[in-house]
Amino acid sequence: MCERVGFREIHYGGRDGTDANKLYVNGREVKLRGTCRHDVSPRGGRSTTAQEDWDEISAYRDANINHIRTSHYPPSRHLLRACDELGMYVEEENSACFKGANGVDIYAAPEEFLSPFTEMVERDRNHPCVIIWSLGNESGFERTAGFRMEYDYIKANDPSRPVIFSYPHTVETLPLPYDVCSRHYEDVNGVLGSPSMPVLHDEFAHIPCYDLDELRRDPNVHNYWGQSLRRGWERLFVTDGALGADLWGGIDDVFPLPEGMEGRWQRHSQGTWSGYGEWGCVLDCWRRLKPEAYLTRKAYSPVRLDERAAVSYGGKLIVPVKNWFDHTGFAELKLMCAVDGGSPCKVALPAIEPHAEGLLAIDVPEGAQSVALSFMRGAREIDAFCIRLKGAARAKSAACDCPPAISQTRDEICVDCRSARFVFSRRSSQLVRAEFGGEVLLTGGPHLHVTGRELGAWNTYRAPVASLVDGQAVVVLHGSYGGSPRVQFVLHINGDGSFTVEYQLAEGSWRNAELAEVGLAFDMPGDVESVSWEREAPYSVYPEGHIGRGLGTAQRVCAPALEAGYGAKPGWEWQDDMFNAFEFAPDDPAGGLATNDFRTMREHIRSYEVSLAAGRGRVCVKANADVAARVEMAPKGARLIVDMLWRYPHLGWGNDMGRELSLLFGGALGAARIELGAGK
């Protein structure tokens, strides 16, 4: 048998004068940017091919991951060979999982723990990628002699690698059976390190997957998760004694079952596909990149550059930069620079050593507005940035000096503008329709929009009023939802048809940990075709089509996805999915109405434009990056939602869920600026 081997040296536990709370590979401290992973194949279930294993590890490397935890069993030989060749560290775990903890008993003899552990060690000890041995996952150490037998065996046969065990809090005897302390789902703002030994958060920042209602309502939860990892990793890297993190998990645990198969042991889904859930930080079950893949790549990036700290002076752009590689100096990288969208050219990088920082100095011509930077290692891009030097002037809407006209009948209030018309019902105290150029763009509203609390039916308790004030038509609508809460909407309509709507609650207070969105909504016709937006995004560069991009257009329909239908093998990207056979049942009326990209809430918008089919018209929300917007489709129509407050209360598992929402009645809750226009 021919076996490829490699050489490297590990220091841990304070050996040779090193720090006891750090792990060293070849003399340098390492920080593990990791993920857990299961074996998942759309064709083979839990059985993967050599090519699938290689492609998986390659995708992790592209996401700036340098470590995997083989939860909760040894991987295939193919996967370890891929890790050896691609430079991926491995925590290899014995197949002892959920034994004697969390209410689970133990039915195996101690020897049955030792046997698979010794087989794993003897099979894989020559792989240099394996740097940590794991005795088992989330188990009670003292409930069996098996775990102590594993520890004694490994210390007698391979003391060169450290040992980890989860749960360490169940250990009551000495010597401690681990050299690295395992911690699961520590809060991203919590205690991350230790002065006595390295802490590896080998289950961290769980990817959103369990609350299907949240996932079905708004795909932006995938995007929102990224801020937890970014914040958590920035704290982990600089925390003494924090070895790193392994996200849960790497690839979606979802299995597209063959048609007609009824038997299944896992029923987490609402659709026909089975599995634990869509918990992949990089790949979905079809091995497509998920939105989390780019967010993982950015959060884990070893090139740390803050565009906001860049300074342009004397024909040079000065940029502070940090090297968070463990063994790679910046001299080994290539930096490509493009000014104002021009051809990229190579720029010399300073020789910044690992875990050090310095300054980039880049020549830029006078009057340059943007500088795009791409850091390369060979042919692989590590990270990319775009630094804006001069903000382009934002176009201002031309003022209309022709005020609107108000006419009233017994049943309606009409506001006529230059190209727009608003009709309000006196009976319901609601907008009946809003037209622009003769096309109906809004069909109802405004509505108080909340998720996480049921509202009663709208009833008016006071007739609407309208009058001209300072050249605007001001319309005041009063009503309540099932008697409470009472809400007042005030619309200020300009002569060009643009308007601002303010709303406030009239009495009491309202606090609910389940609240996820608070804002207002308008009904729209069902032939919405696309949404376009500009927003303040966390990153300056995104891949084409990423749901988090700062500027973009999302089509409601992906023709190939719609034609293929429910449960089909995709020939398109994740963001263009219209059917999800894990989240939606085949007959769910909410499924198949729009793409993931279209349904995603856009946070911190400056503009959010909804376009109707055939150029019939458009509705645009204008803001100062302080609101969020999305369109919710239904079989018989659409609803434009503008949120002033939002969070994701079911992210949990150590993630940042956003601040709990509370509403004080009697105070203004918020406002939205909306423009109506002709189609483009």
Which residue ranges define each predicted feature?
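Low-complexity, Pro/Ser/Thr- and charge-rich linker/hinge segments at domain boundaries
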Residues: 8-28, 387-409, 529-534
